[in-house]
Amino acid sequence: MKIGIIGAMEEEVTLLRDKIDNRQTITLGGCEIYTGQLNGTEVALLKSGIGKVAAALGATLLLEHCKPDVIINTGSAGGLASTLKVGDIVVSDEARYHDADVTAFGYEYGQLPGCPAGFKADDKLIAAAESCIRELNLNAVRGLIVSGDAFINGSVGLAKIRHNFPDAVAVEMEATAIAHVCYNFNVPFVVVRAISDVADQQSHLSFDEFLAVAAKQSTLMVETLVQKLAHG
């Protein structure tokens, strides 16, 4: 099995990258892909860049060039569920765009023409992630993750997301674009991110302060998940 891992920022991939043996670097389309073995398992780690276009471009290049069997999207996210705090884990059961609106033509809010309203994560990957969470004794929430090209740190943006997606557990800027590409390629995916901030008016301050905490937690989760997927 070859496992594809996608993170947007240097801070979100550096700990994992340092653990890859026999590492080689591929630069394509402004993205960097690091291939090798993570604890004996073949991996391809993508640093995509921030935002939906960068994530979709990177995911496409990763899938075409490295042919992974599954995709794990890792990194940080803003917490929406009331039980979440910095360092906690969110696992996707679905991903949707929070900034797409073609409802004038009868589509659901967040749905693009020719696409489902949401992109479902793979049940087996979800189950494996939840098993890792129990083993590591981490606090985690599974649910809807929403994505858009905006960092949410104000009451207006937050209120709009809560109104349109009352069940969303986290918000970030890449996951749904990655899920969209995986849907088109028919490749299983799951989003496993750590909370770096609570999506409120001070989130930009807590994000800078706690990004390292989120990166450490998400790296721990992904490393454990890779082991479980490879060896059961």
From Swiss-Prot:
Subunit structure: Homodimer.
Species of provenance: Salmonella schwarzengrund (strain CVM19633)
UniProt cross-references to InterPro entries, sorted A to Z: MTA_SAH_Nsdase, Nucleoside_phosphorylase_d, Nucleoside_phosphorylase_sf
The keyword Hydrolase appears for this protein: yes
Pfam families found in the cross-reference section: PNP_UDP_1
Pathway info: Amino-acid biosynthesis; L-methionine biosynthesis via salvage pathway; S-methyl-5-thio-alpha-D-ribose 1-phosphate from S-methyl-5'-thioadenosine (hydrolase route): step 1/2
Name of the featured protein: 5'-methylthioadenosine/S-adenosylhomocysteine nucleosidase
Keywords: Amino-acid biosynthesis, Hydrolase, Methionine biosynthesis
NCBIfam families attached to this UniProt entry: MTA_SAH-Nsdase, PRK05584.1
Family membership noted in the UniProt record: Belongs to the PNP/UDP phosphorylase family. MtnN subfamily.
MF terms (GO), sorted A to Z: adenosylhomocysteine nucleosidase activity; methylthioadenosine nucleosidase activity
Gene3D superfamilies with a match to the protein in the record: Nucleoside phosphorylase domain
Positions with a binding annotation for substrate: 78, 152, 173-174
Active site (UniProt): 12 (proton acceptor), 197 (proton donor)
CC terms in the record's Gene Ontology section: cytosol
Function: Catalyzes the irreversible cleavage of the glycosidic bond in both 5'-methylthioadenosine (MTA) and S-adenosylhomocysteine (SAH/AdoHcy) to adenine and the corresponding thioribose, 5'-methylthioribose and S-ribosylhomocysteine, respectively. Also cleaves 5'-deoxyadenosine, a toxic by-product of radical S-adenosylmethionine (SAM) enzymes, into 5-deoxyribose and adenine. Thus, is required for in vivo function of the radical SAM enzymes biotin synthase and lipoic acid synthase, that are inhibited by 5'-deoxyadenosine accumulation.
